[in-house]
Amino acid sequence: MRRVRVGDEVIVTAGRSKGKQGKILRILGDERVIVQDVNMVKRHTRPNPTANKPGGIIEREASIHISNVMLYNPATEKGDRIGFRRLEDGRKVRYFKSNDEIIDV
């Protein structure tokens, strides 16, 4: 089970996008994530007439190392550390370490 999942709200803790908040769009391998509207880069693309795509400068999200994001805790309105716990019925769930609130229900 991963500490962060697609759709989780995270805060960037390091780098040029430090302090920004967004949802995880994709997880690349074991170490990198793409966060919505964070770490934006510009890519220059050529026009492709066969695919009917115009050229130009496109702005998109670049990946961030997973150690540079923390899960956003709405109760404390900050980034928070994550722990794992087993419930009475045997399910493994994530919880916030600061206030013991369960994330996965």
UniProtKB/Swiss-Prot annotation:
GO terms for cellular component: ribonucleoprotein complex; ribosome. It comes from Nitrosococcus oceani (strain ATCC 19707 / BCRC 17464 / JCM 30415 / NCIMB 11848 / C-107). InterPro entries: KOW, Rib_uL2_dom2, Ribosomal_uL24, Ribosomal_uL24_KOW, Translation_prot_SH3-like_sf. Keywords: Ribonucleoprotein, Ribosomal protein, RNA-binding, rRNA-binding. Belongs to the universal ribosomal protein uL24 family. This is Large ribosomal subunit protein uL24. One of two assembly initiator proteins, it binds directly to the 5'-end of the 23S rRNA, where it nucleates assembly of the 50S subunit. One of the proteins that surrounds the polypeptide exit tunnel on the outside of the subunit. The keyword RNA-binding applies. GO terms for molecular function: rRNA binding; structural constituent of ribosome. GO terms for biological process: translation. It holds the Pfam family ribosomal_L24. The lineage of its organism: Bacteria, Pseudomonadati, Pseudomonadota, Gammaproteobacteria, Chromatiales. The gene is rplX. The keyword Transcription regulation does not apply. Part of the 50S ribosomal subunit.
